[in-house]
Amino acid sequence: MATNISTSPKEDVPKEKFHLDILNFSQTSQIQFGLRLQDYKKYRQYCSKRIQRLRSQLRKQYGKKNYVNKIVLNGGETEKQINDVRYLQISLLKTERAWSYAMDLKAQFEKDNDSRIGFHMNRRFGKASRNSTQLYELCKLVADQYTIIEAHAYSSWMASSLSLTKQDFKKALEEINISKTIYEKLSEQGDHSQKELYQKRIEETEPIIRFCLYNLKNEKNTSNKVSQNTLTIIEQSLEELKNQENKKKSSTSSTTTTTATTTIEWKSKSIKVDEKLDEKLKIFNEFKKENENKLPKNINASIDTTSNISPIFNIYDKLVYNLINCETIVKNDLSTLVRVNLKNKSVKSEIEEQSTRILLAYIMYHKMKYLYERNSILITMMQRVLDGEKVDESAIKKKVKKVTWNDLVRLSTHQVKVYTIMSESRDTDSNKEIARDQDAQLILLKSIRLYYIAVCLAKSLKFSETMAVLDRVLTNIQNVRKTNTKNQQILNDTNELESNIKKQRSQIHANSFIQQLSENQDLKNQMSSLSIGGITTASGKSNDLISGLDSFDTSFLTEKKLVQLPPQLQPVQAKPIFFDLAFNSVTFPSLDQRKKGSSTGTPSKGLFGFWGRG
């Protein structure tokens, strides 16, 4: 028994609109397949092969055996036929093939000036314009709003190319202005990579507009603006695009909690940061705000190294640690982009790679900045320890157990690398004054490193190598001054380094002379025979330095005596130390005989003896 099965009509499900990055697709194909070297023939051959490959994938091949009707714009039937985005790609590649053929013929026409080639060129430009218009109409039926707007700008661009070949400059100016206006509006809405792509396209429109205005200078009522009707149509399309994007954002926000993405401005470009990196950057910024006041504002100024300086090193280490986490994320993203570009490079992916590199430069600059400040403080402390000054040794002992000049060489080498990366990643590359200070500071850091190496060589008694290194440091100091830097701190450090080198050179000269005399016996004998005069011993050599001040004698190199102890006894005319005690023990001759002799003589006459009276 037959039963009638009633089939209910299917509900109309809204068909998903196709999306095609027209400008990115065309620009990528042009750069990869010939147009980087202006080889239009190679690009045309690529377009033909790509169209054939797409048709074979869609099983829409045209040939003698199987005849397939071409797609005709007929409303609903067209929507049923176009059930894949590859149909839009075929239409775009047909436009690109006709345009590349026309550009190849244009180059031949400019050389030969053959009218037949010029006629063929106009036909090809006309076909490219018709195919771009067909692409625009197809996008209206089956593509999303973003693709429709891009197709409109692309169609206007091809129409302006056709009008230029026909020397219809007024029509060409109108079409190129429409294309420029659309790309300007799209650059305001897209992300960084799309913005760069549209900006390049806008720059390409400028010479075309100037050429049209030059040829229309004698005509009246020529304006460089889009008509009001066209502008309203463009604005309506862009308003629809904004509404669609807002709907997508609202639908995603209902399911997931989204946070506002931050943008970083570096090297005159603004870059959006993804959520994963944004979290790490927020941690870094919060820690920086909390502890920035504890860091020294000027590392070159006098730092109190005697107090507890360990917390400052901990802050620097934490800042660098947070930036290393950010660096790891960006480097992973960059490696994936590079790997993708090796297989399938596009203009959009190249711009994304460039923006990722700029983002990496931003992170590397701040990381190297904090590393440079931290190492500068550590070098200052180590140098003060070697000079015998008091510092907070607890902070240094965490880094090294015992400070030596080799530690300063290692740190200064690291400082040169850090400052080189920091200067390469700096934001203001165009400022000549900053670039000049960077060059001077880098040469100064290399000079300081060489100075520490010279000190280590001097400690190893390699005096000739030390002198060679110090001569090179002096050459670098002259190069610092040739940069004409006006940074006072760099000039002060240069002068201080030069004074230290002069002191070191005088010590090395003396030590080198002593070493040569002690090692070379012939030279020592020759120098010992020289004498200008002075007090010498019986052997002809002075026994000590004090006794040979007026003579040139090298015997002190082996003896090294400042004064002879005990000294030789010599008669000295001086009062005895204990004269009174010595006087008590001295026996003098008796005076009794002299006393008796005086009593037996003539008696005295008295007061009146002068007149002869007794």
Curated annotation (Swiss-Prot):
The keyword RNA-binding applies. GO terms for cellular component: endoplasmic reticulum; nucleolus; signal recognition particle, endoplasmic reticulum targeting. The N-terminus is required for RNA-binding. Belongs to the SRP68 family. This is Signal recognition particle subunit SRP68. Keywords: Cytoplasm, Endoplasmic reticulum, Nucleus, Ribonucleoprotein, RNA-binding, Signal recognition particle. Component of the signal recognition particle (SRP) complex, a ribonucleoprotein complex that mediates the cotranslational targeting of secretory and membrane proteins to the endoplasmic reticulum (ER). The SRP complex interacts with the signal sequence in nascent secretory and membrane proteins and directs them to the membrane of the ER. The SRP complex targets the ribosome-nascent chain complex to the SRP receptor (SR), which is anchored in the ER, where SR compaction and GTPase rearrangement drive cotranslational protein translocation into the ER. InterPro entries: SRP68, SRP68-RBD, SRP68_N_sf. One of its GO terms (biological process) is SRP-dependent cotranslational protein targeting to membrane. It holds the Pfam family SRP68. It is found in: Cytoplasm; Nucleus, Nucleolus; Endoplasmic reticulum. Heterodimer with srp72. Srp68-srp72 heterodimer formation is stabilized by the presence of 7SL RNA. Component of a signal recognition particle (SRP) complex that consists of a 7SL RNA molecule and six protein subunits: srp72, srp68, srp54, srp19, srp14 and srp9. Within the SRP complex, interacts (via C-terminus) with srp72 (via N-terminus).
